[in-house]
Amino acid sequence: MDYFQDFIAALSNFIKKDNLKIDVPMKNHTSFKVGGPVDVLVMPEKYEEINRIIELCEKYDVNYYIIGNGSNLLVRDGGLRGVAIKLLKLNKLQIGNNKIIAGCGVPLGYLSRKARDKSLTGLEFACGIPGSVGGAVAMNAGAYNGEISNVVESVLVIDNKGKMKRLYRDELQFGYRSSAILKHKYIALEVTFTLQKGDREKIANRIDDLMRRRIEKQPLEYPSAGSTFKRPVGHFAAKLIEDSGLKGKGIGGAQVSDKHSGFIINKNDATAKDILDLIKFVQNTVKSKFNVELDTEVRIIGEDK
């Protein structure tokens, strides 16, 4: 216990009191609204603080997890042993003629609207994606025929040796829901976007149209992590799930949405185990019916209860 207190004391030397919390329910920090407690939640306000936190974790042999706004995250019911480093306070935004520099904690929807306000086109597709910039660039988030990779010029990262460096587009190895950042477990700090000048009214109309389509077709009224599964090559996950007769299928408080089969939702006070059991059931059913493997798009971390 003294060892843990020493670790907390070392963190509190440079992390503001309000940005350092003990024994925090992760369900309050994920869009699924499930998950057990994390031992320590820390919210750095400067890039340099991240390195210092990681150095302390290594010194005291403490696990750490990098999280954004938790919109693509499922934390198991036993929670997280160690430290969750939440990057949402790294949210500076600079807008130039056709460039935007965004901190990793900037919400994507906010970024999309700011681009619209400056008559910059290229980020309309991101208007309804609930993630933040750091997670979005790491997984090359996309929707409605748009992807983050189409508009990224460079990303400032912390590499796995703790060094800060800038990766340019050709070094980022973007693929479907993947990048060099994800592959090498780098931490995305700041992204430079290159956009095009456009007609503000057309940009606004496109955003309005995409938001309307989202509201009509997605179960936004329930907690979820967006699309639960990646798109398998040559197929659509939602169609495979629906054709397997799983639309509306529930386990505990979790359900395959009857509005969009690609979403597993927290319909009625689900546990993480309910959601994980339903994910496994869907994967097994689709595999047995169509011989197609469904890989999860959502990131799953933590311990079972």
From Swiss-Prot:
Pathway assigned in UniProt: Cell wall biogenesis; peptidoglycan biosynthesis
Primary site of residence: cytoplasm
Cofactor: FAD
Domain FAD-binding PCMH-type: residue ranges: 33-198
GO biological process, alphabetically ordered: cell division; cell wall organization; peptidoglycan biosynthetic process; regulation of cell shape
A single GO cellular-component term on record: cytosol
Enzyme Commission code: 1.3.1.98
Catalytic activity: UDP-N-acetyl-alpha-D-muramate + NADP(+) = UDP-N-acetyl-3-O-(1-carboxyvinyl)-alpha-D-glucosamine + NADPH + H(+)
Residues annotated as catalytic: R177, S227, E297
UniProt key word Nuclease: no
Pfam families linked: FAD_binding_4 (PF01565), MurB_C (PF02873)
Keyword Hydrolase: no
Localization terms from the record: Cytoplasm
Record NCBIfam families: murB, PRK13905.1
Biological role stated in the UniProt entry: Cell wall formation.
Protein name per the record: UDP-N-acetylenolpyruvoylglucosamine reductase
Gene: murB
